[in-house]
């Protein structure tokens, strides 16, 4: 997978810039505040159709302009491609002359690994960051995983809305229906995440050992839902237990106003030498673990796509 060229117009601090890349290694050198990070963000954007730094496309538009454009020529295992993106008020994406209507249509064209100083929070930060790490990695190559994530969030919003209205209507058949969908989609998300870790965890462990004088890194999925039936292939048994948990938690969830069980509440447990890195790891250990996870992504994406 090689990006051959990139044209930027009105993207962050770039008025207009054209770049041609070497097929192997490229180094970007310059003074502070000259646009090195913005250039890297443009590369991240053409791979994911989103920024690694900004929350909205509008924030990426050069000051005083209405929108930005990115054009890239790249090659992957399927051949050569031309990409054109317009962003700002409305996003338009064209690949090889064809309009991309939904992000899922673009998944698999380009993959990217972003490593920044902020990735230390992947180890010591909120569990939501580690969940996002898993889901974003899956969504780079797996269309089904990406669609599942979108659908699960919508179903979760519906259940949470019903929970907040129980004082008025109680628990009715609508709750049963939404919970059934939540169980189905949630189970599939869990399976996807566990499959991801089956590949990623050993790679991270091997990398960590090589850069930390042999210290053992463990990456384990952490859930308040008993996963043993799912791990052993007893999916129906797991789903039935999942339904019962949601049913038992209805009163508590209604009081809190949100769903307290499910993959949206799970976490990764990262330990080195048997010690929790989030709670007790030194900053050096946390940085090494974050780097190990990021380097493991290289092997994972190679396994999934067949190319670097």
Cite the ranges covered by each PLM segment:
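Post-Walker A helix-loop "phosphate-sensing" segment adjacent to the P-loop in P-loop NTPases
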Residues: 45-57, 296-305
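Long, charged N-terminal accessory/stalk domains
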Residues: 121-122, 128-169, 173-176, 180-183
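Conserved lysine of the Walker
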Residues: 35-36
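Nucleotide-state sensing region of NTPase/ATPase domains
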Residues: 47-129, 133, 138-145, 201-206, ...
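Intracellular alpha-helical coupling/juxtamembrane segments of multi-pass membrane proteins
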Residues: 60-63, 152-155, 193
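Conserved NTPase motor "head" modules and their coupling/switch loops across ABC/AAA+ ATPases, GTPases
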Residues: 1-31, 169-184, 188-308
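ABC ATPase nucleotide-binding domain signature
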Residues: 25, 43, 117-119, 274
